[in-house]
UniProtKB/Swiss-Prot annotation:
Species in which this protein is naturally found: Clostridium beijerinckii (strain ATCC 51743 / NCIMB 8052)
Family per record: Belongs to the universal ribosomal protein uS2 family.
GO biological process, one term: translation
SUPFAM superfamilies: Ribosomal protein S2
Annotated protein name in UniProt: Small ribosomal subunit protein uS2
InterPro entries: Ribosomal_uS2 (IPR001865), Ribosomal_uS2_bac/mit/plastid (IPR005706), Ribosomal_uS2_CS (IPR018130), Ribosomal_uS2_flav_dom_sf (IPR023591)
Gene that this polypeptide is encoded by: rpsB
Keyword Membrane: no
Keyword set, alphabetical order: Ribonucleoprotein, Ribosomal protein
One Gene Ontology molecular-function label: structural constituent of ribosome
Cross-referenced Pfam families: Ribosomal_S2 (PF00318)
Signal sequence bounds: none
GO cellular component: cytosolic small ribosomal subunit
Length: 233
């Protein structure tokens, strides 16, 4: 029994690729046919590749390592946040800031700043500050929360894998993963370069349902792996 069925993939529209003029020839092995100027992804390959990715992610989680979910495009933001939270993992769904992993000490400083402002709000400091100052601090807090809220408890040295929606959009994240030797699992559409990714899941990265289905499966893999880790203890 495969982790994702052909029926689920079809219903979520995972098979719809990009227009034929916007394609990467390296994706040819994953393309089934062309219909009305759009490439149709070979879902038998997706089933197989999703299984491989699932087993890898499960193993990473079982070893006690963390998985970082990354997807900043509109169609991915919600699923990335929800599934990372559900599986007790970390996420980036607004903007990948340069050095998020390769220069984590600087990022850590920004997270501390966020925590500092939050503390000021909680302990009543805001009540005694000038209104203008409070507005400025609230604006800064919102921006920091948007960009860093999903990685505030991240231990960058414990990231065992990165799950990405749309490697074309997240090329900076992939670059940092490469520098640090972190394997990348990704939903790869017909306009992407599969060679950038260690575990390719060929699929539609523009449909919310398709993204949600595959992202949820990766979260399931983490939860299954973590159960194994607890049992081993």
């Amino acid at each position: 029994m495969s982790v994702i069925s052909m029926k689920q993939l079809l219903e979520a529209g995972v098979h719809f690729g990009h227009q034929t003029r916007r394609w990467n020839p390296k994706m040819a092995p994953y393309i089934f046919t062309e219909r009305n100027g759009i490439y149709i992804i070979d879902l038998q390959k997706t089933v197989k590749k999703a299984e491989e990715a699932y087993n890898f992610v499960k193993q990473v989680a079982e070893e006690g390592k963390d998985i970082l979910f990354v997807g900043t495009k509109k169609q991915a933001q919600e699923a990335i946040q929800e599934e990372a939270i559900r599986s007790n993992m970390h996420f980036v769904n607004n903007r990948w800031l340069g050095g998020m992993l390769t220069n984590f000490s600087t990022i850590r400083g920004r997270i501390r700043k966020l925590e500092q402002i939050e503390k000021m709000q909680e302990d009543g400091t805001f009540d005694v500050l000038p209104k203008k100052e409070v507005i400025k601090l609230k604006g800064e807090m919102e921006k920091l929360e948007k960009n860093l809220g999903g990685i505030r408890n991240l231990d960058a040295s414990n990231v065992g894998a990165m799950f990405i929606v749309d490697p074309r959009k997240e090329k900076n994240a992939i670059l940092e993963a490469k520098i640090l030797g972190i394997p990348v699992v990704a939903i790869v559409d017909t306009n992407c370069d599969p060679e950038e990714v260690d575990y390719v899941i060929p699929g539609n990265d523009d449909a919310i349902r398709a993204v949600k289905l595959i992202t949820a499966k990766m979260a399931d893999a983490i939860m299954e792996g973590r159960q194994g880790e607890q049992l081993a203890e």
